[in-house]
Regions:
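Extreme N-terminal tail/first-helix region
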Residues: 1-17
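Charged, gly/pro-rich active-site loop segments
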Residues: 2-3, 74-132
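Short alpha-helical scaffold segments that flank and stabilize functional sites
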Residues: 11, 25, 85-87
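Short beta-strand segments
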Residues: 16-49, 57, 65-67, 76-79
Length: 132
């Protein structure tokens, strides 16, 4: 398993958007902007059951996540390729934490009735970067 450096982890901890790439059933890539986080070892993002990312990852857990610094996109990037693990445990708390980080709200305001959130944990197999 590859490891994030502290500088790379800080980029995921910051108020920077990530791009998640999953694989469609036909093998073509599907890229989506997401709110991101890290536990220092893995990359984390949140989605809802039934969304394309979640369906793709249940079928094929290979995933890539790239982050650029929001304040200086010329300074580099970090891209993590790895394997996704999906859990509902703690997902609502996680999306609330991300809402606080990205939009300054204590509760995620876009939760739909009946929506079930999941945390996706990306275990890095490879870390590529430039400037980080």
């Amino acid at each position: 398993m590859a490891k994030l450096s502290e500088k790379q982890a800080e980029l995921f901890r910051g108020k920077n958007w990530g791009t998640v790439v999953t694989l469609r059933e036909d093998g073509s890539p599907h890229a989506t902007p997401v709110w991101i986080d890290t536990d220092g070892e893995n990359v984390l993002f949140n989605t809802a059951i039934g969304r394309a990312k979640e369906r793709h990852l249940r079928r094929d857990p290979r995933v890539a996540v790239t982050v650029l610094p929001a304040d200086d996109q010329q300074s580099g990037y970090v891209s993590v390729s790895g394997t996704a693990e999906i859990t509902e445990e703690g997902a609502n708390d996680h999306i609330d934490k991300l809402a606080k980080k990205y939009i300054g709200q204590d509760k995620y305001p876009y939760l739909q009735p009946g929506e079930r959130r999941v945390v996706v944990t990306v275990k890095p197999d490879k870390v590529d970067s430039m400037g980080s």
